[in-house]
């Protein structure tokens, strides 16, 4: 390698000596194993063999170009729904390729692509090939045109398609479910399409219109939370993310126990273990200990909350900051607050963010969405004779976790 004027490039830059591009270092051997989106090999998946087989049976016809069934996967966060869907989809793609069939497989995070046009654009863009002759711009065309381009891509490039809509309950409109599932029947495209809908809400089907229910059929799978032993095994199967002898013996059992307290959330367990490793690395500690889990827990919660609200508009976050300020500032056991009280503090948050406020009705809608995501809880209250009804809201997260998402600008003075 050539030497620059600043010295020998082979020596590297000490500013970046702690950065391990391959996830390796003194603590980690393969940090990728602790990424939430990582899909492990089949022998690392715990307690979901029956789900894998059942889902494969439902969508299996797609590998031959025949019509697959659409399926709805229900379960709490971290119960393995996305993991199983991605695992089975990838195996289906490989099997179709082996059989010389062109199978489109695509996953859309509906928390990020919430509108119908955004979702269709994302699907079309992800499965598009250079040979299709079709372009899929991010904006500038109608929703109908996005559908037309999707049909063109499917018709020229594929024999079948499997579309996973993760967090499908976050979609602003469920029309897309009916349009996709009935596309072949309606003569839009001569390609069978199967939809895997993933929801954290067990009552999601009840929220669908009758037309959508009819289109999707009745194929449903329930994912129960992992128990403590399953969580321990999940972590054991990923402990080679660390260098040998880095994890102290009690770390994995304690991580599993902490995650089991929150409805068996495997995502939380994996996050906790990763953050504990990051803490040890950042502080130049040679091992990961049980005590590091307590320090890592809040950071894992911050990351989870960021994930939950990532697709929400900015003012949803301002409303959340307002409720966190009220909760943090309360001097009694009453942590329920009326919409009007939250709105007053929301106005203060908007001042710190140098932005205009939205209407009270709009804020009511944003509060309803936060409750839907189980970030807050809402109750309808009666004011008494002649005073009508009103809503009160309560934060379900530690206010400090909310503040740490946006240090410095999230806290305001709630004294009046």
Swiss-Prot record:
The chain's coiled-coil residues are none
**Taxonomically, which superkingdom?**
Archaea
In this chain, ATP is annotated as bound at 79-83, 226, 238
Keywords, in A-Z order = ATP-binding, DNA replication, Nucleotide-binding
Q: Name one Pfam family in it.
A: Cdc6_lid
**UniProt record, GO biological process:** DNA replication
- Tell me the Gene3D superfamilies matching this sequence: 1.10.8.60, P-loop containing nucleotide triphosphate hydrolases, Winged helix-like DNA-binding domain superfamily/Winged helix DNA-binding domain
Keyword ATP-binding listed? The answer is yes
Show the InterPro entries listed in the entry: AAA_16, Cdc6_C, Cdc6_lid, ORC1/CDC6, Orc1/Cdc6_arc, P-loop_NTPase, WH-like_DNA-bd_sf, WH_DNA-bd_sf
Q: List the GO molecular function terms.
A: ATP binding
What's this chain's function? Answer: Involved in regulation of DNA replication.
According to its UniProt record, which protein family does this protein belong to? Belongs to the CDC6/cdc18 family.
Listed name of the protein: ORC1-type DNA replication protein 9
What is the native source organism of this protein? Haloarcula marismortui (strain ATCC 43049 / DSM 3752 / JCM 8966 / VKM B-1809)
Q: Which gene encodes it?
A: cdc6i
């Amino acid at each position: 390698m050539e030497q620059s004027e600043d010295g020998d490039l082979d020596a590297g830059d000490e500013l970046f000596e702690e950065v391990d591009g391959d996830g390796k270092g003194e603590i980690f051997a393969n940090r990728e194993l602790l990424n939430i989106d990582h899909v492990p090999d089949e022998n690392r998946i715990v307690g979901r063999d029956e789900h894998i087989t059942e889902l494969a049976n439902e969508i299996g016809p797609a590998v031959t170009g025949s019509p697959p069934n659409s399926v709805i996967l229900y379960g709490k966060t971290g119960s393995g729904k996305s993991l199983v869907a991605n695992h089975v989809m990838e195996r289906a793609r490989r099997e179709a390729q082996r059989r010389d069939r062109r199978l489109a497989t695509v996953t859309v995070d509906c928390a990020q692509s919430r509108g119908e046009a955004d979702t269709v654009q994302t699907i079309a863009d992800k499965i598009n090939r250079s040979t299709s002759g079709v372009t899929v711009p991010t904006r500038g065309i109608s929703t109908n045109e996005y559908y037309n381009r999707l049909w063109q891509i499917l018709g020229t490039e594929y024999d079948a398609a499997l579309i996973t809509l993760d967090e499908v309950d976050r979609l602003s409109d469920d029309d897309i479910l009916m349009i996709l599932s009935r596309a072949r029947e309606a003569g839009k495209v001569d390609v069978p399409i199967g939809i895997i809908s993933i929801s954290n809400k067990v009552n999601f089907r009840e929220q669908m219109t009758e037309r959508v229910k009819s289109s999707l059929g009745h194929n449903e799978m329930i994912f129960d939370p992992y128990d403590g032993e399953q969580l321990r095994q999940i972590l054991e199967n990923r402990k080679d993310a660390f260098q040998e002898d880095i994890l102290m013996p009690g770390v994995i059992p304690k991580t599993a126990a902490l995650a089991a307290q929150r409805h068996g959330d495997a995502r939380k367990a994996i996050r906790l273990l990763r953050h504990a490793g990051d803490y040890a690395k950042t502080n130049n500690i040679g091992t990961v200990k049980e005590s590091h889990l307590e320090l890592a827990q809040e950071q894992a919660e911050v990351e989870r909350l960021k994930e939950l609200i990532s697709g929400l508009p900015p003012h949803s976050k301002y409303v959340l900051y307002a409720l966190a300020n009220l909760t943090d500032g309360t001097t009694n056991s009453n942590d329920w607050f009326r919409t009007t009280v939250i709105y007053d503090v929301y106005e203060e948050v908007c001042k710190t963010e140098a932005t205009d406020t939205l209407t009270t009705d709009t804020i009511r809608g944003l509060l309803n969405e936060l409750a839907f995501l189980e970030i807050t809880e809402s109750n309808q209250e009666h004011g008494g004779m002649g005073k009508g009804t009103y809503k009160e809201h309560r934060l379900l997260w530690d206010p400090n976790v909310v503040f740490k998402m946006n240090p410095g600008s999230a806290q305001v003075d709630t004294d009046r």
